C-alpha cells in the first residue's frame, strides 16, 4: 500500500522515496546517461534556461552559468561522487539531475537530496527524467543511502510530473 502525505516547506515540495523502489523504475532507452562535469557547465546552463522557460539573454546565460558553477563548488550542498547526472540524445544534453547531501537550507540528514531535475521542453514525457531518477537511485545504493529526498520549488511548472515519477516507485512519502 502506497503511503502519500504532503506538506509545503518554504515554497518547496518534498518527497522521500526508498532507494530499492526507485531502482525498479523504467525510463527512456533513447538517452545515454552519464556523469556531468565542470566542462558541461555551459551546456547545463543552456538546458536550465530552456527547462525553466527563461529567455536565453546574455544576462540570463551568465546567471545560469554562475548557478551551475556554484552547484559544482558545493554551495547548494555537498556533491557526491557522480551525483550530477545528465541525459544525452544524439550528443545533446537534454536533461539533468543534481544531487547533493546536506543542502545549507535544510537540517543535516546525511541523505542524498535532488535539488534540481530539469528536462528540455522538447524531450518531456518520454521517460528521460524517470531514467535519471532510476540511475540516481542505483548510485545512492552505492553510497550506502536507503532513501532519496527530492525538494522541488513550487515555481517549477513541471512539479506534477516529478511527483508522477516518484509515485510510480510505489514506496514514496511526501513530507
What is the predicted function of each stretch?
Residues 46-62, 75:
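Helix-loop element at the rim of GNAT/NAT acetyltransferase active sites that forms part
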Residues 60-84, 88-89, 98:
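Active-site rim helix/loop that mediates acceptor-substrate recognition in acyltransferases
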Residues 116-119, 125-138, 142, 164-165:
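Conserved acetyl-CoA-binding loop-helix of GNAT-fold acetyltransferases
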Residues 32-46, 57:
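A short beta-loop-alpha structural element at the N-terminal edge
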Residues 140-152:
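Conserved GNAT acetyl-CoA-binding A-motif
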Residues 1-31, 160, 171-175:
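Acyl-donor-binding surface of acyltransferase catalytic domains
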Residues 149-160, 164:
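Conserved beta-strand-loop-alpha-helix junction that forms the acyl-donor binding cleft
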Residues 84-86, 92-101, 113, 118:
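Conserved beta-strand in the GNAT
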